[in-house]
Regions:
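Two-component/phosphorelay signaling modules centered on CheY-like receiver
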Residues: 10-31
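Short, hydrophobic alpha-helical segments
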Residues: 107-115
Length: 130
């Protein structure tokens, strides 16, 4: 994985899972993530909970959208996220609950590896559209 990766999810189990599968990632508590983004610190990739992202102040949320890779792990339906957010080529969605295949595809996408998305995985993992 190229560059700095941050993982911040409201669920400790999700943070722990990503910490184990992406050992080079830095795991942040939600409050710490907000503070760092407010200070203008930006990683190359961010894994964040969908509700957590929507609760960020607008200015901070806009900074997150400028990242090269933004993986949103969410239990919200895609309709619960702004269409402009979901359409961004630098944004991918990992729907909770997720299976191992979806998680592996999301991690490969984070790493910048082209991911072949199977038709049944298209809804849970939405990556760059070409």
């Amino acid at each position: 994985m190229a560059g700095l990766v941050w993982v911040s999810d409201r669920e400790p189990g999700i943070r722990q899972l990503f910490a184990e599968l992406v050992p080079e990632a830095e795991v942040l508590e939600p409050g710490e993530l907000t503070s760092r983004l407010r200070l203008g610190q930006l990683p190359d990739a961010l894994v964040i909970d969908g509700t957590q992202l929507m609760e960020l102040p607008q200015r901070v949320q806009r900074r997150a959208l400028l990242l090269p890779r933004l993986l949103i792990c969410t239990g919200l339906s895609l309709g619960g996220l702004p269409p402009s957010l979901v359409a961004e080529p630098s944004v991918a969605i990992l729907a909770k609950p997720f299976c191992v295949d979806d998680l592996e595809a999301a991690i490969e996408w984070l790493r910048g590896t082209p991911v072949k998305v199977e038709p049944d995985l298209l809804a849970p993992v939405v990556g760059p559209r070409h």
